[in-house]
Amino acid sequence: MKLKNLISLILLFSSLSAFSQAAIPQLLKNIPINVVAPASGADSKTLSDLKSIKTLNLNMPAKCFSKGDLPFLASTDEIRFNCLKDALYNESSNIVWSLRGGYGSARLIPDLLKLSKPNKKKFFIGYSDITALHLFLSQEWGWKTIHGTNVAGLLKPEQDQGNVIKLAEILQGKVKQAVINNLAALNNVAKPTELVSGKLTGGNLTMVLSSIGTRWQIKTAGKILFLEDINVAPYQLDRALIQLKQAGLLENIKAIIFGTFDKDSKLTMLVLRNFANDLKVPVFKTDRCGHEKINDPIIYNTDSKIISNGEKFKLIMDL
């Protein structure tokens, strides 16, 4: 009995911790949010737990989360596309928030390319596989989109609470700029840098590579390129970066910012530094954006600048 009671208490405190974190964004209370699942889905408990968060007004139609034939997708391509389209065109909501990443967003882009741009711009949030949609929305529709924690992340107590708080401040207009502090210079070109300005693009490295040769291929010229990834061995990371370079996607860029890559092992950092030293543009590193505990919001397709802040640097993104 004692062991059972202990297990029950552990489960209870774990649940309370998750919901305590989910309840943090009081700034978002009663604001309509359309939740979409353009990639992988979630189990029924996760969906139920999200719906029970009282501080958030989440619109999560059951039809959008019905499983299809492929278990790694939230639903069929048709259902996922229609639910995403409904959310993007919904006049009563200003926020479209992705359930999670995983896989599947790129499968929807051929149909998205057939749509006319909505009259109303929205906040679109997500990361990882959702990078494909960031590229589409920013390049085709000219939207500013937010690389930030997915909705399912609200239930993960291991994630930093600031991930959600900073998102809430942006969505409610409480701040005029999003800031990433303590960027480190990775090459000698970056060290004397006083100012780099340009719009941000990029996201998950695997998805950026997937865009090459498609109608939604990433456009990097004149921009600051942000890249992050997970489950990539150092040699795979090196190969991916070489592919970007040989594809001509690093020509005429303003700078590169690397986010996290699998806890940034010594060999991973060696790969990044070695690659950076072969480039003639400033390259920076941050541990505040990616698949780790901290995932601060990054705003794509907005006027941004990297400025010197002593020995470190700061990324400032206008809203």
Predicted regions and their residues:
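ATP/NTP phosphate-donor binding region
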Residues: 20-92
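Conserved anion/nucleotide-ligand pocket segment
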Residues: 143-207, 213
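ATP/nucleoside-binding phosphotransfer catalytic cores, i.e., glycine-rich phosphate-binding loops
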Residues: 260-319
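Short Gly/Thr/Asp-enriched flexible loops that form oxyanion-binding sites at enzyme active sites
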Residues: 101-119, 135-137, 268-270
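Sec-dependent signal peptide recognition
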Residues: 2-9
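Short, acidic/small-residue loops that bind anionic groups at enzyme active sites
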Residues: 114-136, 144-150, 281-284
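N-terminal signal peptide c-region/cleavage motif recognized by signal peptidases
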Residues: 15-17
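Internal helical hairpin/lid segments
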Residues: 216-268
